[in-house]
UniProtKB/Swiss-Prot annotation:
It catalyses: molybdate(out) + ATP + H2O = molybdate(in) + ADP + phosphate + H(+). This is Molybdenum import ATP-binding protein ModC. The lineage of its organism: Bacteria, Pseudomonadati, Pseudomonadota, Gammaproteobacteria, Alteromonadales. InterPro entries: AAA+_ATPase, ABC_transporter-like_ATP-bd, ABC_transporter-like_CS, Mo/tungstate-bd_C_term_dom, ModC_ABC_ATP-bd, Molybdenum_import_ModC, Mop_domain, P-loop_NTPase. It comes from Shewanella sp. (strain MR-7). Part of the ABC transporter complex ModABC involved in molybdenum import. Responsible for energy coupling to the transport system. Gene3D superfamilies: 2.40.50.100, P-loop containing nucleotide triphosphate hydrolases (3.40.50.300). Its EC number is 7.3.2.5.
Amino acid sequence: MLNINIEKQLGQLQLKVNTQLPLQGVTAVFGRSGAGKTSLVNLLGGLTTPDKGEISLGDTLLFKHKTVNLPPEKRRIGYVFQEARLFPHYSVNGNLTYGMRHKTPELFDKVVSLLGIEKLLSRYPSTLSGGEKQRVAIGRALLTSPQMLLMDEPLASLDLPRKRELLPYLQTLAQELKLPIVYVSHSLDEILQLADHMLVLHQGKMIAQGPLTQVWNSEQMRPWVPLQELSSLLSARIADRHPDYPMTRLLMDDGNQLWVSGQLPPTHKQLKVRIQANHVSVCTEEPKGSSVRNLLRGKIKELYPSDNGEQIQLKIALGKDELWANITPWARDELQLIPGKAIYAQIKGVTMTQMDIAESH
């Protein structure tokens, strides 16, 4: 485990985090600007020093107040910043090999292949696109043979086409490398595609931490997501494809099924499916003759009025999964919706695209 129990005064912000993170998969650190995300990873990487506390990575003690403070180069932690920070006078090959602990051709070839940078090795940073620079920066960090990788919003400085270019490489790294990654982001799109676990910071304090789906659907997460962007993550597996239409059928653990747009590639892995709360409607009886392809049976768990009183955020239990729906107070009163009541949730199949679906690692 990555054990963190630290405090740091940062101007008016006091960062205080006490938690354990798994040494496998991708842990996303999420929060608004100024929440302390970058400050936390700087403390983990040794770029800044806590005022008190302790940090350990597995059996290695990285920091203990007044007794141990390993410098960054001794922590065996790779760091990828928002900007690539490549050496302009080195070629891509020179940047990659700078700082390599062991000159092993096998590791070099594997990293270069995973990142798709074989054809860039002789070029210089000034000739690379933003996405290419970040791929080289990631490769350089990996070739130091780290025990953990810190990534501080590596897509933040890129435009949308470059983000789309780089994201598949990050997905491949997350799936192929047996290396824990702490990934800072304020983008839920990135977190959906990459993360297995999630830690939420607010004003320097941790307000939620755990498996991605659990935190994403939690009440703690709800206040930090704009009302119109509230969504749920459901777990499902591919069952089959429709023989006549470009749609794929997914099966949930509770027996409900989901039809989603597109012919998804076969996989035995569990999928994470994002559903926007504004795309969910509810009814108390099974509808007949509807164009809506998805009808999920569940029970009302909780109802939360929005701050302005214009909407109700309805949480629906679907076995172990949970689904958010935005409804009006009128609908709540007319349908007599209360906790424990059995209902049907309707979701149009066309609202879930491949950008809303990701494999669990």
